[in-house]
Amino acid sequence: MTDLWVLDYPNGATQPSAVIHQTSDDEDFGSPTLNLSVGSHHVYFIASRGQGATLDTESHTLTFSRVLDTFYKDYTIDVTGTSNGSRTVTLDRCVTKLTAVITDEIPTGAATFNITPTAWHYGIDYVSGNPTAATASQ
């Protein structure tokens, strides 16, 4: 991964109270530090090797000029007056993932199959975790 974004949304907030962007050149890459207020928070994590990233907190999207491996997690945390410490968060792959469901019988001698995508997605809505910015197949 070359980039990590961490966005903190306190419960009910429409804009993040904190945005952290780390690159792999940063000494603390992969170990972001947040100071969270008491209450419930949605903390969104996005890690990617994508190029030409643009973050838009109004539309809750992160788009790329070229998408490569990308991982994501919507992490909910409840902070009390006595909460502190670190959390380990495991991100889920969300880009360059393919799930093929084949309902037809596969011939015994079949060794490969071809897939032709109808659209490429160049972004993620980090609140829903869904892809955005679809364009025609390349």
PLM regions and their residue ranges:
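Tryptophan-paired
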Residues: 2-56, 109-138
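Generic structural detector for well-ordered beta-strands
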Residues: 33-35, 76-78, 88-90, 101, ...
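A short, Gly/Thr-enriched small/hydrophobic beta-strand-prone motif that recurs across taxa
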Residues: 91-106
